[in-house]
Amino acid sequence: VLEDSGDRPRDFDIDVNGTRNVLDACVAAGVEQLVVTSSGAAYGYHPDNPAWLDEEDALRGNPEFAYSDHKRQVEALLAEYRQSHPALKQLVLRPGTVLGAHTRNLITRLFEKPRLVAVAGSASPFVFIWDQDVVGIIEQGVNQDRSGCFNLAGDGALSIDELGDLLGKSVMHVPAWLIRSGLWIGNRLRLTQYVPAQVNFLRYRPVLSNRRLKEEFGYIPRKTSEQVFRFFMAAARQRGQL
């Protein structure tokens, strides 16, 4: 569930119990390989995240952010099945922000605002991966019968100020406490779908290293993070969304 439905038990049932159902079905049917699109969100949004997250770094999630917490729990479940059912190969992909010609979601709507909002004192940048690179990675993983866990991101990262420059929009650097207060009021008045807990989503973004993707998996993303964003931006402007 990409966007919180407001019914956390329902979302948990879909995300975590649904994954368990798929795993059980794979084991029962003798499936040899399972490809799972997890998320960089499984690492969590934490102030002590390393500058570049490697696949060996801890998956901590955030209990206050259902999407991140459920991704962490799904990954824990996958790890259990890797131990108990080693015959089922798992290829687990952890993408950063996926963008393509037609992407529109909770993240891209941040870029549609007249001005971008940043948390004062936070330098946490964005990493992007082109949706067609995600397709290529899955295709290569299936064709080569690969297993393992890999971050998906284009080369480089972009700060919120760099995104503002590309979009031609100003960036407001607002204290975290003020953003939380504004989101609390806005959410109570149904003026925004964002909630106070999502401040850390902007403040401590997981920045994914793609070293293992390139060196071990053997896939070189066709677009860098900046090229992905420029491609998305051009397509969104054609649709009148930016």
Task: Map each language-model feature to its residues.
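Conserved Rossmann-fold NAD(P)-dependent oxidoreductase catalytic core, especially the SDR/UDP-sugar
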Residues: 17-66
